[in-house]
């Protein structure tokens, strides 16, 4: 296979006690969209909400951020049951102790490490008589990385303990040894007295992105080999501390790779099964489909329980199930920052509770991108400030407002409403999530044996959180609003559209507390959320917002209809707009290049913003000529990679020689370029890939429909299939191709490109 290639161009809010607002209770004459029937006397599941709302702390987290007092207080208010370290894929790349390897200052320069300590098998010789900051490896050769993180494991352990929560440790299977893991157990639990109970063996070793997935003989890690390694690690670690709990395989997704083999062959060394979940697909666009992806969790947990019953039936009540990493999706786009992240997470945690998941750790505390990121916080590194994102408040609501016993309930009616009902020593807790983006929902309660009681309704909606996709920050992020309501055996309440609601009903002998009204903008200031400069061929999402931008408060009182107008080469989707929770959206469709000014007016309030619409000119830039040494290409292949000068007249081409090998799962990569060269162009302007492909004239393929896929990778979207070429069309002759990126969300991700496959 030969390839000729060019690129085608183109401050934390603390919890405030809030608000007696207008009643959410409605007259009995209001229509009912859904009915919730509750039997508070029948418990159907038990769980510790704190254990289901754990999180992850990564070594690359910035020290000034984790030392930020507002950040620390927000986590204390959250009460996560555990915090997993040292951080995702780095778990397989990081030696926790650098004593004897680090010989200089604690920076990342190669001269500060004794490279003679690397053994022939790629492992490193560490002196465990003392502790020094650890070090990170890179690549299959296990060379030292040029970045080892801002934190070290001692900092992680002590920071977690200072917050009053527990650490969960993932040990290095990818490049470490059982002895390295056992030394961590000894140091943490015997020397330092950290008291770490949960230890996970390896991270996502089913994935070819993980160091350790590729074995020394060139084959790939599988479930049988992983389980053998697990047992070796477990023996060494239990020899140090027999009371610790060990688990794995921390598989990358709900396909549950390696889980069956571990339960079948791991025996009583397995104390818990850990899995990871990012179930919403990269190309899932509709909100309803994103929420539907949560159902995959139920199927996965049922499969795990089936394997436990099959292979270790005497331990069905003993082996725990944990989800040591989860978030809405892998790619860190706006879904990880907008309000949907909160609603999705609230339902996800509820389903984990229903299915009997024992513990879970959201991914993560501090990993972010400009467009969003998995972090539960918005992080401004310039000011070293943090602000909770919407997902934080979903975690907070489950951890602080919900009970530990789920009771019997049934919900009928409007499909967009989801419910979870728990009880505790203090009372009954009812969580209702309205996933409709357009409609409120009237929900009637029928509570068996209930009498009249004063309750508190906590509501989280766009009135509490709004993410500005153009400014890429929250315009406001506030705790759930609280209002007092009276509930009896048949009460109806209205749920705002796209909202989380928790109704706390104390037992009859208890009393609620009155609250002060929430802070709100006194006078509205209109603003337009728009980009500054955009291509003239893309529709523009826009918002009118009524708020106090300095105080980050929405204006929630009524405001006259907003009148919109435009000067310049574009049209508006509408001439007027009504605000809902201080926000209204519209669309601008460009009709050419030039300056565009949008005006918004409501009574005496007005604002204007200008946009530059940029004309599009396309040209191709050649990035690889393949006439230089292969080592300079920054390329690799599953197959033999070479340079050929005899296939194309007067040109060099890249060649992947199959040599009779058959592509198969995890071994089908023709060319992988990473990192991409940035010298000639700004990736933010790139909008496709162009090149030429040819297969040998005698190449045979049993599948006439076989295709070669072209995939771009970005820090904002790690897997973007942008096109494919039918294999039969390139056998024996060169075929040019040009594949353009057209989806707005993928164009937005181009600025952070790092790989081409």
Where are the language model's segments positioned?
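N-terminal catalytic cores of secreted or lumenal carbohydrate-active enzymes
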Residues: 31-268
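Extracellular carbohydrate-recognition regions
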Residues: 51, 616-640
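Aromatic/acidic polysaccharide-binding cleft in carbohydrate-active enzymes
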Residues: 91, 323, 327-426
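Noncatalytic carbohydrate-binding groove/subsite architecture in carbohydrate-active enzymes
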Residues: 223-345, 355
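Carbohydrate-binding surface patches
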Residues: 415-453, 457-462, 499-504
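Short S/T/G/P-enriched beta-strand
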Residues: 514-554, 605-618
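Short carbohydrate-recognition loop motifs
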Residues: 643-669
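Extracellular ligand-binding interfaces
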Residues: 662-752
């Amino acid at each position: 296979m030969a390839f000729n290639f060019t690129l085608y161009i183109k401050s934390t809010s603390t919890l405030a006690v809030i608000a007696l607002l207008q009643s959410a209770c409605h007259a009995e004459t209001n229509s009912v969209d859904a009915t919730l029937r509750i039997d508070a006397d029948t418990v159907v599941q038990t769980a510790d909400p704190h254990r289901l709302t754990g999180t992850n702390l990564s070594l690359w987290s910035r020290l000034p951020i984790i030392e930020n007092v507002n950040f620390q207080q927000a986590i204390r208010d959250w009460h996560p049951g555990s915090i997993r370290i040292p951080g995702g894929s780095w778990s397989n790349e990081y030696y926790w102790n650098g004593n004897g390897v680090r010989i200089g200052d604690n920076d990342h320069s190669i001269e500060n490490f004794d490279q003679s300590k690397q053994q022939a098998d790629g492992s490193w010789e560490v002196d465990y008589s003392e502790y020094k900051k650890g070090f990170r490896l890179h690549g299959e050769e296990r060379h030292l990385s040029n970045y080892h993180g801002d934190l070290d494991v001692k900092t992680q352990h002590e920071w977690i303990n200072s917050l009053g929560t527990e650490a969960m440790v993932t040990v290095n299977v990818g490049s470490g040894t059982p002895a390295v893991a056992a030394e961590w157990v000894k140091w943490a639990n015997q020397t330092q007295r950290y008291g770490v109970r949960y230890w996970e063996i390896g991270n996502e070793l089913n994935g070819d992105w993980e160091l350790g997935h590729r074995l020394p003989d060139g084959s790939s890690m599988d479930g049988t080999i992983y389980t053998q390694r697990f047992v070796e690690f477990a023996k060494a670690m239990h020899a140090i501390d027999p009371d610790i709990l060990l688990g794995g395989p921390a598989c990358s997704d709900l396909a549950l790779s390696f889980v069956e083999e571990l339960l079948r062959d791991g025996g009583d060394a397995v104390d818990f099964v850990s899995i990871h979940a990012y179930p919403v697909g990269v190309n899932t666009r509709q909100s309803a489909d994103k929420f539907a992806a949560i159902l995959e969790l139920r199927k996965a947990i049922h499969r795990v329980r089936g394997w436990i019953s099959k292979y270790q039936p005497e331990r069905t009540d003993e082996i725990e199930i944990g989800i040591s990493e989860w978030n809405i999706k892998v790619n860190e786009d706006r879904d990880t920052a907008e309000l949907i992240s909160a609603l999705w997470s609230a339902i996800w945690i509820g389903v984990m509770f229903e299915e009997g998941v024992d513990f879970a750790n959201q991914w993560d505390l501090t990993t972010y991108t400009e467009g969003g990121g998995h972090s539960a916080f918005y992080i401004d590194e310039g000011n070293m400030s943090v602000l909770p994102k919407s997902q934080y408040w979903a975690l907070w609501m489950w951890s602080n407002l919900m009970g530990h016993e789920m009771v019997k309930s049934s919900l009928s009616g409007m499909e967009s409403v989801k419910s979870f009902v728990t009880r505790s020593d203090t009372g009954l807790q009812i969580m209702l999530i309205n996933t409709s983006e357009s409609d409120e929902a009237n929900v009637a309660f029928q509570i068996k044996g209930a009498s009249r009681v004063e309750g508190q309704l906590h509501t989280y909606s766009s009135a509490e959180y709004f993410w500005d996709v153009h400014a890429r920050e929250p315009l406001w992020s506030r705790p759930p609003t609280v209002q007092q309501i009276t509930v009896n055996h048949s009460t109806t309440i209205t749920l705002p559209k796209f909202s989380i609601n928790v109704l706390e009903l104390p037992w009859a002998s208890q009393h609620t507390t009155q609250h002060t009204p929430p802070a709100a903008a006194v006078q509205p200031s209109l603003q337009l959320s728009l980009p500054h400069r955009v291509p003239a061929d893309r529709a523009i999402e826009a918002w009118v917002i009524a708020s106090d931008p300095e105080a980050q408060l929405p204006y929630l009182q009524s405001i006259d209809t907003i009148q919109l107008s435009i000067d310049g080469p574009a049209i508006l989707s509408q001439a007027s707009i009504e605000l809902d929770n201080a926000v209204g959206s519209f669309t601008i469709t460009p009709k050419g290049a030039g300056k565009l000014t949008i005006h918004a007016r409501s009574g005496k309030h007005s604002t204007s913003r200008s946009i530059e619409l940029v004309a599009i000119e396309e040209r191709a830039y050649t990035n690889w000529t393949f006439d230089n040494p292969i080592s300079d290409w920054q390329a690799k292949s599953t197959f033999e990679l070479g340079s050929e000068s005899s296939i194309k007249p007067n040109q060099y081409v890249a060649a992947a020689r199959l040599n009779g090998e058959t592509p198969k799962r995890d071994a089908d990569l023709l060319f992988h370029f990473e990192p991409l060269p940035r010298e000639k162009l700004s990736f933010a302007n790139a909008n496709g890939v162009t090149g030429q492909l040819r297969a040998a004239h005698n190449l045979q393929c049993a599948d006439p429909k076989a295709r070669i896929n072209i995939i771009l990778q970005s820090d904002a979207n790690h897997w973007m299939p942008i096109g494919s070429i039918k294999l039969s069309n390139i056998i024996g002759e060169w075929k040019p191709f040009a594949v353009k990126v057209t989806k707005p969300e993928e164009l937005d991700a181009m600025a952070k490109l790092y790989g081409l496959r």
